[in-house]
């Protein structure tokens, strides 16, 4: 039974290239019953070319991909962009284990079925890259290519993620560990969503300098928001007031608990995936990051980028965009769009060309 519903609020598809991408109502908003939850997603370019699925990270929403939706649809692709479970207008289950990787990948498999599609290129940013990589690894029959933005997701390690992160933190608290606490980070982030989001978006971007930049580690007992700084004056032009307002309105409505539950499943994901020891992603892949992304500063994280081709043997290219931080798709949409379209064109044409994976 088709359980999808669709509502085009804004412009017809043919006019998408002319719309204000910052207007969330300019896109085709849909809902489907997927893997036991009600999922919200954007669906543009129905009935045209190959399917591309875009997965957001934290603290983002489908909306972070707004400029990619327009560019990819204009280029002839069907573009589907969900709010992942726990985010935005998608359902937010209460149980922490409802956010483990088996459920997240199950959501993508279920979404494909609801769409009536059998093949897609999957693209993920930040924690969306965790889901995208796992989906590509577990279901190569469905996902023909993989793109990760900003977060180099490692293969399954020999120890639980929490153990490795504690060693990296050297007595301090890495943000993943902070977010694993119950209720405390939820309350702190939700106390003033506008301050939270403006501080996070600015500090993790390439626009922040010096002491404004995101501190990945806080001291024991220090509030996580001390690691971020609000911009002085107007926000940089890559995030308009209208865009910030949309993020703030959604997180004010939903809170942060669903999103934080992904971090609370880090060890659980490791525990349930022993069968992935030594597994690699064999499909063609691409990595796009920011040279000014604070998240790449720890040597342990940077080494994942440097050694990426070891576990992505079909890596076509890895790129660090100069002056760009952790929000590459928003900070530098033209460059990101160009790289995505180049990769997709090669993939769809069957071009085996592979540049040296250097950035």
How should these model regions be labeled?
Residues 29-31, 79-81, 317-320:
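Conserved beta-strand scaffold positions in the cores of enzyme catalytic domains, especially
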Residues 1-18, 357-359:
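N-terminal targeting or regulatory segments adjacent to alpha/beta-hydrolase or S9 domains
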Residues 9-27, 38-39, 44, 51, ...:
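Flexible "cap/lid" subdomain of the alpha/beta-hydrolase fold that forms the substrate-access gate
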Residues 38, 42-91, 125:
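Conserved HGGG/HGGXW glycine-rich cap/lid loop of the alpha/beta-hydrolase fold
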Residues 66, 133-137, 337-341:
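Short, hydrophobic alpha-helix immediately C-terminal to the catalytic nucleophile
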Residues 314-359:
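Catalytic active-site module of serine/aspartate enzymes centered on a nucleophile-bearing elbow/loop
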């Amino acid at each position: 039974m088709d359980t999808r519903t669709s509502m085009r609020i804004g412009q017809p598809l043919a006019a998408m290239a002319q719309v204000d991408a910052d207007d969330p109502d300019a896109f085709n908003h849909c809902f489907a019953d997927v893997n036991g939850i009600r999922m919200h997603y954007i669906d543009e370019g129905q009935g045209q070319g190959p399917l591309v699925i875009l997965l957001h990270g934290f603290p983002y929403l489908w909306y972070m991909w707004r400029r990619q939706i327009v560019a990819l649809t204009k280029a002839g692709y069907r573009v589907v962009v969900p709010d992942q479970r726990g985010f935005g207008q998608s359902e937010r289950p209460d149980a922490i284990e409802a956010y483990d990787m088996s459920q997240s990948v199950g959501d993508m498999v279920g979404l494909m079925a609801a769409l009536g599609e059998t093949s897609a290129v999957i693209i993920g940013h930040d924690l969306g890259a965790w889901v995208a990589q796992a989906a590509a690894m577990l279901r190569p029959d469905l996902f023909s290519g993989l793109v990760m933005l900003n977060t180099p997701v490692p293969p399954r390690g020999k120890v639980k993620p929490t153990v490795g992160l504690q060693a990296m933190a050297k007595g301090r608290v890495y943000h993943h560990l902070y977010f694993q606490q119950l209720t405390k980070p939820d309350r702190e982030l939700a106390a003033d969503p506008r301050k939270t989001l403006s501080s996070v978006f600015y500090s993790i971007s390439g626009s922040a300098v010096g002491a404004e930049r995101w501190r990945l580690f806080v001291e024991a007992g220090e509030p996580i928001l001390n690691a971020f700084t609000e911009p002085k004056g107007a926000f940089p032009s890559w995030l308009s007031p209208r865009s910030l307002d949309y993020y703030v309105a959604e997180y004010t409505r939903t809170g942060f608990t669903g999103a934080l539950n992904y971090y609370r499943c880090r060890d659980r994901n490791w525990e349930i995936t022993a069968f992935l020891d030594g597994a690699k992603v064999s499909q063609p892949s691409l990595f796009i990051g920011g040279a000014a992304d604070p998240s790449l500063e720890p040597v342990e994280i940077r080494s994942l980028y440097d050694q990426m081709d070891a576990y992505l043997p079909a890596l076509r290219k890895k790129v660090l965009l100069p002056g760009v931080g952790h929000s590459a798709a928003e900070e530098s949409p033209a460059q990101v769009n160009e790289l995505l379209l180049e990769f997709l064109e090669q993939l769809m044409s069957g071009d085996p060309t592979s540049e040296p994976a250097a950035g």
